[in-house]
Amino acid sequence: MNLFDLPARMPCEASGLLLERPGLRIERIVSWGQRSPEGFWYDQEEDEWVCLVRGSALLSFERFDVLLTCGDHLLIPARLRHRVAAASENPPAVWLCAFGHFDSGRETV
């Protein structure tokens, strides 16, 4: 799969599994302006490393927001509640996401 070979526009996000190994899952997610439903928060058991490879997005945490543009990345520790407050539509937001249990680094929210 080429990261930039995008599926036709869909009413919901398109997620594709790129790699899965014990303790690690890597996905490509394409968003055409979708955001988390009002009142919904991700509260994951795994750490999530996100890299925005196209477009822009706004991630909301309980006490702050993070604006991501093309090339930005960060590590979201497990159990840190977050939601997608906004994602670009044209161009669509293309995410590369790795899920697992990682050591914290400077990129941690």
Q: Where does each model-flagged region fall?
A:
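A short, N-terminal "cap"/entry segment at the start of jelly-roll beta-barrel domains
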Residues: M1-W41
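Short histidine-centered beta-strand/loop micro-motifs
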Residues: G16-L18, E38-Q44, F61, V66, ...
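A structure-centric signal for secondary-structure junctions around beta-strands
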Residues: G23, E46, P92-A93
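Beta-strand residues in well-ordered beta-sheet regions across diverse protein folds
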Residues: E27, L52-V53, S60, A85
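Short, conserved beta-strand element in jelly-roll/cupin
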Residues: D43-L59
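Structural motif
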Residues: S56-L58, D65, R81
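Short acidic-glycine-tyrosine-enriched beta hairpin
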Residues: R63-A78
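Ligand-binding loop in jelly-roll beta-barrel domains
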Residues: R79-R106
